[in-house]
C-alpha cells in the first residue's frame, strides 16, 4: 500500500503568487514560451532575472501591445518583489512549474485514492528516504517527490522542472531508490521526469550531465 505525507515546508506567499502565474499561463498557452525563456535566461539569479525581464519588456508599448500581454508583463514584474533573495527565487521557480503541472495531474488521476504534491512516499507505512554516502553540491538527502498518485493497484510519480538543467543527482538517485523499493514490493508503477522543453533536448541535457544513460 502507498500513502503520502506532506514534506515541503509551506510558503504561502510563494504558493499564492505561483498559482497566479500558473492561471495566467494556462489561460494563454503562448505565455509558457515567454515564461520559459525568461526563467532559462535568468538561471538561479534573481538579479539576473530583473535584467532579462527589463530587456524583454522594453519593446512593449502600452498603446499598441495586446492588453493581455501587458497584464502578463505586470505580473512578471512582481517576481523580485515577491522574492527577497536567490533562495526564494529558486524555490518560486520550482513551485510555479509544479502549479502549472498540477491541474493536468489532477485530471489524469481524478479517481486516485491517494494523491499528493511535494510529498513523502510511504510504502507499507515505511517512508522512502535517500541518503547519499557523501554529500556534494548536487547529491544530498532527498525524501519527497513533486507529484504522486496511487489508485490501489498502480502508482505514478513525477519530478517536475522548468528546465532539464535543474535536475540534480539527488533527484535521480531518489527516484532510483523509489523504483527499487516499489519493485521489492511488486508494485506496478511509472516514474516520469517532466520539463517544459521538448523530449529530445531534455534527454540530451540529462545525458550530458550523466544523469541518464543512452537506453
Question: What kind of feature is each model-predicted range?
Answer:
Residues 1-215:
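Intrinsically disordered, low-complexity Ser/Thr/Pro/Gly-rich regulatory segments
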Amino acid at each position: 500500500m502507498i500513502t503520502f505525507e506532506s514534506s515541503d515546508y509551506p510558503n504561502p506567499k510563494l504558493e499564492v503568487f505561483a498559482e497566479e502565474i500558473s492561471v495566467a499561463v494556462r489561460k494563454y498557452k503562448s505565455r509558457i514560451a515567454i515564461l520559459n525563456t525568461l526563467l532559462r535566461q535568468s538561471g538561479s539569479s534573481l538579479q539576473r532575472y530583473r535584467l532579462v525581464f527589463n530587456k524583454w519588456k522594453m519593446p512593449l508599448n502600452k498603446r499598441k501591445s495586446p492588453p493581455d500581454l501587458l497584464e502578463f508583463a505586470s505580473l512578471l514584474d512582481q517576481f523580485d518583489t515577491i522574492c527577497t533573495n536567490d533562495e526564494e527565487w529558486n524555490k518560486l521557480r520550482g513551485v510555479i512549474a509544479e502549479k502549472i503541472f498540477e491541474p493536468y495531474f489532477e485530471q489524469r488521476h481524478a479517481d486516485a485514492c491517494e494523491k499528493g504534491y511535494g510529498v513523502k512516499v510511504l510504502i507499507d507505512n515505511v517512508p522512502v528516504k535517500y541518503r547519499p554516502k557523501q554529500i556534494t553540491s548536487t547529491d544530498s538527502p532527498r525524501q519527497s517527490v513533486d507529484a504522486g498518485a496511487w489508485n490501489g493497484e498502480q502508482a505514478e510519480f513525477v519530478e517536475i522542472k522548468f528546465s532539464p538543467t535543474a535536475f540534480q543527482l539527488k533527484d535521480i538517485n531518489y527516484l532510483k531508490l523509489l523504483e527499487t523499493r516499489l519493485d521489492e514490493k511488486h508494485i506496478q508503477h511509472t516514474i516520469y521526469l517532466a520539463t517544459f522543453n521538448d523530449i529530445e533536448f531534455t534527454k540530451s541535457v540529462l545525458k550530458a550531465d550523466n544523469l541518464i544513460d543512452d537506453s
